Design a protein with these regions (language model features):
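Flexible "arm" and connector segments at domain edges
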Residues: 1-70, 76-267
Length: 267
């Protein structure tokens, strides 16, 4: 890479996406950064996962400054991986942009063609039909196998339940059925061996995910919010006691203190 280009980049007041690609080319090129040059898709795989979660956290905390920063980190990962592929001649970042542009145009025929879609449900139905046609997935099994196994378990369960129909119980209309199912599984777990207990616990979690989906709730979002509330509760108890609640209280006192705190919140 021309040293003059590197010098000019340092003097810019505002950078563009093209500049990001150029910087990555410099870092990966001859005489570039030793660390960047050594990386492979596999070696920075976890970085991509971590950066993605940090974007989600920025969204959840409604912090636009942090969101801007974290989106940049994710964009860096995209450019990094695309640059590796360009170096071996398989594709480059323009190919990536081309493919997603073509996909968006093809999957929005109600915008770029004459297909009618008067509401969100019709748009989503068209999207899934076009997606299935593109991927040549003609069976439900194909669609289920196409759901990435690396997804968070609760999110994956939602997708499998929605596509398979194996969670057809209408817990939203009959919440007592959900309660009965969970109680039955709890009873069976108490009597089962370790191997069976794990299976029953999985069924219980899937039933809980189904209940949420039927009510229009996302399991990941709901569990994250509840976990955050419990952290906040513990911090408040620690502040009120001036000590670690687990050391200052017996398990029974800790449970009672937490219940009192929840009741004060109207929970």
């Amino acid at each position: 890479m021309n040293e003059r280009v590197a010098e000019l980049l340092q003097k810019k007041e505002k950078y563009t996406f093209t500049d990001l690609c150029t910087i990555m080319e410099i870092l990966r090129g001859e005489g570039g950064c030793p660390w960047d040059r050594e990386q492979t898709h596999a070696s920075i795989r976890n970085n991509f996962i971590e950066e993605t979660y940090e974007v989600i956290e920025a969204i959840d905390t409604e912090d636009p400054k942090l969101l801007r920063e974290e989106l940049g980190d994710v964009l860096l990962q995209v450019v990094f991986h695309a640059r590796m592929e360009e170096e071996i001649g398989r594709f480059d970042i323009d190919d990536v942009a081309n493919d997603i542009c073509a996909k968006l145009i093809h999957r929005h025929p109600h915008i770029f063609s004459d297909v009618k879609a008067d509401n969100t449900d019709q748009v989503l139905a068209n999207w899934e039909a076009i997606k299935a046609d593109e991927k040549a997935r003609v069976t439900v099994s194909d669609k289920l196998n196409a759901i990435p196994s690396i997804l968070p378990a609760l999110m994956r369960a939602e997708k499998v339940g929605k596509k398979s129909g194996l969670d057809s119980a209408d817990y939203a209309a009959n919440p007592e059925e959900a309660i009965a199912t969970l109680m039955m599984l709890t009873t069976q777990m108490a009597e089962a061996d370790d191997a069976k207990r794990g299976q029953l616990y999985g069924e219980m979690l899937f039933a809980a995910v189904t209940l949420g989906r039927k009510l229009g709730l996302e399991a990941e979002t709901a569990l994250t919010a509840e976990t955050d509330r419990r952290i906040a509760d513990y911090m408040q108890m620690e502040q009120e006691l001036g000590a670690d609640p687990q050391k200052a209280l017996t398990p029974e006192q800790l449970a009672a203190k937490w219940q009192t705190l929840r009741e004060a919140y109207g929970e």
